[in-house]
Amino acid sequence: MGVNFNICLLLLLVATISSQPLKATEKDDSTDENPFGIYRRGSQCAVYGGRCIPTSVRCPPNTFQCDLSGCSWSERCCCHL
């Protein structure tokens, strides 16, 4: 009798868990897509069409390093030509 009761409890537990919606698949659009949640859309670099690039990476083609504020200490602003 004890084994049957344990099996019934196990089936009830599995049915309860499997009926729950998966919240991991929902996308939260309220979070910023920048790393570490840094918000740069209103920065001087972004206003002039620049992008914050890590200092270890060269600026992309057709861009140059410009001295505009708004990037973190480990990044620099790359502006379009």
From Swiss-Prot:
Subcellular location: Secreted; Nematocyst
GO CC terms of this entry: extracellular region; nematocyst
Span of the signal peptide: 1-19
Propeptide: 20-39
Keyword Signal: yes
Single GO molecular function: toxin activity
Keywords: Cleavage on pair of basic residues, Disulfide bond, Nematocyst, Neurotoxin, Secreted, Signal, Toxin
Keyword Signal: yes
Record-linked PROSITE patterns: MYOTOXINS_2 (PS51345)
Record PTM text: The basic myotoxic domain of rattlesnake crotamine toxins (with 6 Cys residues) has been detected in this protein. However, this protein contains 2 additional Cys at the C-terminal region. Hence, this protein may contain 4 disulfide bonds instead of the 3 suggested by the myotoxin domain.
Similarity-based family: Belongs to the Cnidaria small cysteine-rich protein (SCRiP) family. alpha subfamily.
Function, as annotated: Induces neurotoxic symptoms on zebrafish. Has also been claimed to be implied in calcification, but tests on homolog proteins suggest that proteins of this family have a neurotoxic function and not a calcification function.
Protein name (record): Small cysteine-rich protein 1 2
UniProt source species: Montipora capitata (Rice coral)
